[in-house]
């Protein structure tokens, strides 16, 4: 393992980094700074420095770069193939990012914790009460989080785009991606890339 690209440094995303001592860890600078300061009750619980104390090679990025499907400041990463891009998606944390991967079948966008449930990407979004409460409790900036959800939702429902969006915590989306990796192709021409998660 030479490179690990993180959406953010919450404990459930950064666990195990020390198991890859030779890897370069890529993250937005704002995320690294918040994780280092750990100011406030939530930050002291969400960021656990013991998970990355042994990491020797970090790459920090400021939001800058090109436009990509309606998102700004999208950039490539040092030493990583150009098919992998970092997409700033602040809100859940101020340094939260999505990771876009250009594949022969189209783009994959790991939206991390920008949303938690597949139905949040529906044209008429919904979320289970528990997940909604957790998102609100953990958010750094509600307006930014909701704005990024709106932009992700618009992209997910744009039948002309070739972007498949998924989050970090929805098991149905995970199963769909696992089927995709085995060659399963459920979509008809012109259908939403998100429809397969219904």
State where each predicted segment sits.
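Short, well-ordered alpha-helical microsegments
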Residues: 12-14, 94-97, 174
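Metallo-beta-lactamase
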Residues: 29-88, 137-160, 190
């Amino acid at each position: 393992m030479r490179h690990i690209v993180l959406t953010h440094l919450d404990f459930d995303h950064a666990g195990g980094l020390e198991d890859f001592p030779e890897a370069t860890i890529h993250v937005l600078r704002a995320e690294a700074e918040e994780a280092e300061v750990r100011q406030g009750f939530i930050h002291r619980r969400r960021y656990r420095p013991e998970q990355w104390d042994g990491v020797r090679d970090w790459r920090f990025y400021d939001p800058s770069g090109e436009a990509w499907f309606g998102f700004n400041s999208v950039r490539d990463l040092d030493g990583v193939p150009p098919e992998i891009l970092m997409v700033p998606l602040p809100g859940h944390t101020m340094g939260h990012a999505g990771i876009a991967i250009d594949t022969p079948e189209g783009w994959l966008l790991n939206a991390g914790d920008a949303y938690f449930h597949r139905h949040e990407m529906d044209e008429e979004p919904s979320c289970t009460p528990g997940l909604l409460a957790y998102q609100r409790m953990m958010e750094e900036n509600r307006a930014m989080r909701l704005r990024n959800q709106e932009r992700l939702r618009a992209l997910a429902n744009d039948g002309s785009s070739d972007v498949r969006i998924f989050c970090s915590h929805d098991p149905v989306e995970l199963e769909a991606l696992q089927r995709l990796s085995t060659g399963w192709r459920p979509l008809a021409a012109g259908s939403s890339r998100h429809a397969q998660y219904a």
